């Protein structure tokens, strides 16, 4: 299952669609896409 907004992650692949893994905070954040 994918990680939702502010969920923990190691890479962007861990996050749900339209989310990207922040390298500084290790959490999923919106990547700016719709």
From Swiss-Prot:
GO cellular component, one term: extracellular space
Effect on the protein of changing residue 24 to A: Exhibits 20-fold tigher interaction with Kv2.1 channels
Record site: May be involved in interaction with voltage sensor: 3, 5-6, 22
Effect of residue 4 to A: Exhibits 7.5-fold weaker interaction with Kv2.1 channels
SUPFAM superfamilies noted in UniProt: omega toxin-like
Annotated domain remarks: The presence of a 'disulfide through disulfide knot' structurally defines this protein as a knottin.
Other remarks in the entry: Shows no or very low activity on Nav1.2/SCN2A, Nav1.4/SCN4A, Nav1.5/SCN5A, Nav1.6/SCN8A, and Nav1.7/SCN9A (IC(50)>3 uM).
Protein name: Kappa-theraphotoxin-Scg1a
Organism: Stromatopelma calceatum griseipes (Feather leg baboon tarantula)
């Amino acid at each position: 299952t994918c990680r939702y907004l502010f969920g923990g992650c190691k890479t962007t692949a861990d996050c749900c669609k339209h989310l990207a893994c922040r390298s500084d905070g290790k959490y999923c954040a919106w990547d700016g896409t719709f």
